[in-house]
Structure formats: structure tokens, C-alpha cells
């Protein structure tokens, strides 16, 4: 539910990250938090102008962003964790519970959970989601039917991209090639898993090359689960980069996870990151699920925590996004499709500081670039009047406590997220 469109005119004053405002606009220098106090003018759901405010006027203004992007999700299994738990929180437990859930997966359940996910994402301030779909087995067809239906239903609100997740070798079979053509014809991407751990055998190399060549022929992108382990450090992303370079393949390619690469020593990590940048390989880091599952020992807290080396990749010129991955399913018990929750988590987990451009871009402009979205998320004259306005006036306030928010889409204010409504569990708790 959303309110009526706002009349043309000025929106309330706000504080924006300078990195999300037109780089060509004549604006005052950002403050020490990277913020600029501005007042936006909108008409017909578009930004008409960006007006500057007097210096020192932003201290009590709300912090605002443009709607953010979720580059890696699994809508087909979201919210299934209560029914198919993984109490030990292990990779083996996740795979076993996922298998039990998949055997009972039906179109109506995927549709219901997917609708729940998109409704929450919409209210929280997400404008696009890329979701992988388990696509080899009897659950594949009903999952695709449900999510294609939801993609159409949510078009214009949350852009939904779909990736076919199968063993990489499946794309070499006649059935796999036919399915790839169907996926590409429906605007999807080809996916697969390298690992975990990935040992890079000759058969693996041949299967991956066949997938990349197939994607190039079909003109579609590839998004792989790569190196999601604490072993064989970076071997999968190294093979991907090498094949793209040697065979001069023009395939939009994303490596999701790249977790074991983070355990490389500085020199090898830097050289691999440079090779990935040269091959135009993008990366989606997934700290929530990776820190929950990888390197886990039942009797001790691990000191080595495999996750993508975001800073080293960025320094080499690799486009890096951060995603939430699994949401309340056997792979991760938390999450809620809340990009601000993910941003707050990543401060401690990945040392990403949002007051710097490269700390914010993985959730905004870099994620939009990896998904190939029409809008990069930067506000300029003519861009969508889409905002995520927070009940915090600084990054410190945002990080201190979960902020309330209001989302503006095409000049209409949305209803607040469901989490901001009083919980019925607390109905009896009053003075």
C-alpha cells in the first residue's frame, strides 16, 4: 500500500552521501561523514532539481539514501528454516535440511514465501534482487513458474533477476543446453557451484569452459557460487579469470562468495585480485552466511573466518557488491531482506564503513552495476524520485540502533516496514 503521489514541489531537507548525488552538480564539500545537506525538488515521480542548504544546517536532518540492491538471494527457500531447521549450523546440516525441504517444495509455497520476501524488501527499501533457484530436480519447474509469476507481478517496484543454479557439468548435457536456452529466453542467468572446496580438476575446467562458451552464444550472464569454503584458497576464481582471459570470452560474470580467497597471503591475494579485475570478474561478498557456516568447529571459536577480501578486490579495481544470501532457511537462520540490517552487520563483519564511498557502494552503485540495472542509484536531474529516508541523522545513530525508515518510490511514500508495527507478542507487556 502506498500513499497518493506527492504534488510537484520540494521534499523535506535531508542529509545525503555525496557519492549518491550527481558528481557534476555544484554542491558544497561533504562533511566528515561524507554527507551533504540538500533539498530535492520532484515532479511526476522524478527529481527535478537538487538544492543546497546553508552550511551547518544538516545536524538535525534525517540521513537518506537511494533504495539499495540485493545482489544474491535464494527466494525459493527463504523462510523455510523453521520447518527444516539446521540446529548445528553446519554446511553438512544445511545441505541435508535443504534436501528435505526441496523434496517438498511446491509452486504455492515458493509463491507465498517469495511474495513475503518481496513485500518486505519493498518496504525496507530494496529496489532489485537477484535470486538463485535450485534448478535440477522435480522442484525446478514449479519454482521457476512461481518466481517468473512474481517477477511479472512486482515489475516496476522490485526488479527480480533469476539465476539457474545447477551443477556446472549439467550445462554440457543436451538437457542442460536446452534448459540454458530456455533460461536465456526468459531473461535469466546461468549459474552453478565450483566447490566447496573446489579442487580444479581437468573435468572441472572443461565443464566451466563449456558453460562460459554456452553463455556467450546465448548472450546471457553467469553468476557462480565459487570458493565457498575454507580450503583450496581462491582456486575457483583463479580458474574463472584464467578461462575468460585465455579464451577472450565476453560474458558478464559474477563470482558469488569467493570466501576462501580471503585466506590467501597478501601477495597472492593481490595478484589474483588484479587478474580478476583484468578479466572483468565481479564479486558478491556474502558475509552473513559465510561467517555462520564456514570454518565452524563444535568445540572452539575459529580464528580464521573465510570471507571475500573486499578491500583488496576493490583496490585492484574489481567491482564488489555485498549480499544477504540466505534468509531464515537451513543455511542461515537470520536475515529479513533488510539492506540496512545487512549494512550494519557488515561494519563489524567486513570492516566496511558507509561514510566512505567504497564502504557504501557494495550496497548501492556497485551492486547496481553488477546487476546491469538501468539506474546506478545516483540522484541527478531526471532520476527516479526514489528515496530511503532513515530515522537517524548520522551514521553513528544508524549504527547505534536499528532506525525507523520511510521509503519514497516514484514520488509516493510507502507504508513503513512490518517490523515497525507493535508486536502482538508484547501485547500483555504494559505498565
Language-model segments: which ranges?
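Active-site gating loops and adjacent loop-to-helix segments of metal-dependent hydrolytic enzymes
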Residues: 78-110, 186-189, 236-254, 279-283, ...
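His/Asp/Glu-enriched, well-ordered alpha-helical/loop segment
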Residues: 242-253, 293, 304-390
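C-terminal cap of metal-dependent C-N hydrolases
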Residues: 362, 379-431
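Alpha-helical scaffold segments that flank or form the walls of functional sites
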Residues: 63, 81-132, 138-153, 181-184
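N-terminal metal-binding scaffold of metallo-dependent hydrolase/deaminase domains
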Residues: 1-56, 395
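Active-site mouth loops of central-metabolism enzymes
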Residues: 97-112, 163-174, 194-202
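Di-metal (Zn2+ and/or Mg2+/Mn2+) metal-binding site signature of metallo-dependent hydrolases
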Residues: 61-84, 229-230
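Histidine/acidic residue-rich metal-binding segments in metalloenzymes
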Residues: 142-156, 173-256, 260-282, 299-322, ...
Amino acid at each position: 500500500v502506498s500513499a497518493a503521489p506527492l504534488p510537484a514541489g520540494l521534499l523535506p531537507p535531508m542529509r545525503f552521501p555525496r557519492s549518491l548525488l550527481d558528481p557534476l552538480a555544484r554542491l558544497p564539500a561533504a562533511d566528515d561523514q561524507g554527507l551533504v545537506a540538500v533539498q530535492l525538488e520532484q515532479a511526476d515521480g522524478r527529481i527535478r532539481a537538487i538544492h543546497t542548504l546553508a552550511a551547518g544546517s544538516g545536524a538535525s536532518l534525517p540521513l537518506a539514501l537511494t533504495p539499495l540492491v540485493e545482489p544474491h538471494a535464494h527466494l525459493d527457500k527463504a523462510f523455510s528454516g523453521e520447518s527444516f531447521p539446521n540446529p548445528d549450523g553446519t554446511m553438512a546440516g544445511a545441505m541435508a535440511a535443504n534436501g528435505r525441504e526441496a523434496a517438498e517444495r511446491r509452486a504455492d509455497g515458493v509463491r507465498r514465501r517469495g511474495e513475503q520476501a518481496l513485500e518486505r524488501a519493498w518496504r525496507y527499501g530494496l529496489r532489485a534482487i537477484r535470486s538463485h533457484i535450485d534448478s535440477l530436480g522435480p522442484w525446478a519447474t514449479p519454482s521457476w513458474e512461481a518466481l517468473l509469476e512474481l517477477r511479472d507481478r512486482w515489475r516496476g517496484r522490485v526488479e527480480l533477476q533469476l539465476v539457474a543454479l545447477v551443477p556446472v557439468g549439467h550445462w554440457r548435457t543436451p538437457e542442460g543446453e536446452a534448459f540454458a536456452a530456455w533460461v536465456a529466453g526468459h531473461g535469466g542467468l546461468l549459474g552453478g557451484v565450483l566447490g566447496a572446496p573446489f579442487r580444479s580438476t581437468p573435468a572441472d575446467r572443461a565443464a566451466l569452459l563449456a558453460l562460459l562458451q554456452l553463455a556467450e552464444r546465448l548472450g546471457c550472464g553467469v553468476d557462480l557460487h565459487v570458493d565457498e569454503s575454507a580450503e583450496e584458497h581462491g582456486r575457483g576464481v583463479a580458474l574463472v579469470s584464467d578461462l575468460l582471459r585465455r579464451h577472450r570470452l565476453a560474458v558478464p560474470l559474477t563470482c558469488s562468495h569467493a570466501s576462501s580467497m580471503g585466506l590467501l597471503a597478501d601477495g597472492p591475494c593481490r595478484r589474483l585480485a588484479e587478474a580478476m579485475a583484468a578479466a572483468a570478474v565481479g564479486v558478491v561478498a556474502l558475509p552473513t552466511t559465510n561467517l555462520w557456516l564456514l570454518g565452524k568447529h563444535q568445540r572452539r571459536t575459529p580464528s580464521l573466518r573465510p570471507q571475500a577480501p573486499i578491500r583488496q578486490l576493490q583496490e585492484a579495481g574489481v567491482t564488489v557488491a555485498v549480499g544477504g544470501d540466505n534468509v531464515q532457511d537451513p543455511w542461515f537462520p537470520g536475515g529479513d531482506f533488510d539492506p540496512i540490517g545487512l549494512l550494519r552487520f557488515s561494519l563489524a563483519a567486513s570492516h566496511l564503513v558507509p561514510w566512505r564511498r567504497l564502504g557504501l557502494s557494495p550496497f548501492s552503485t556497485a551492486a547496481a552495476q553488477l546487476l546491469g540495472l538501468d539506474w546506478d542509484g545516483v540522484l541527478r536531474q531526471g532520476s527516479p524520485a526514489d528515496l530511503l529516508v532513515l530515522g537517524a541523522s548520522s551514521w553513528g545513530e544508524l549504527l547505534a540502533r536499528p532506525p525507523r525508515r520511510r521509503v519514497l518510490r516514484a514520488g509516493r511514500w510507502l507504508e513503513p516496514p512490518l517490523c515497525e508495527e507493535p508486536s502482538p507478542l508484547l501485547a500483555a507487556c504494559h505498565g
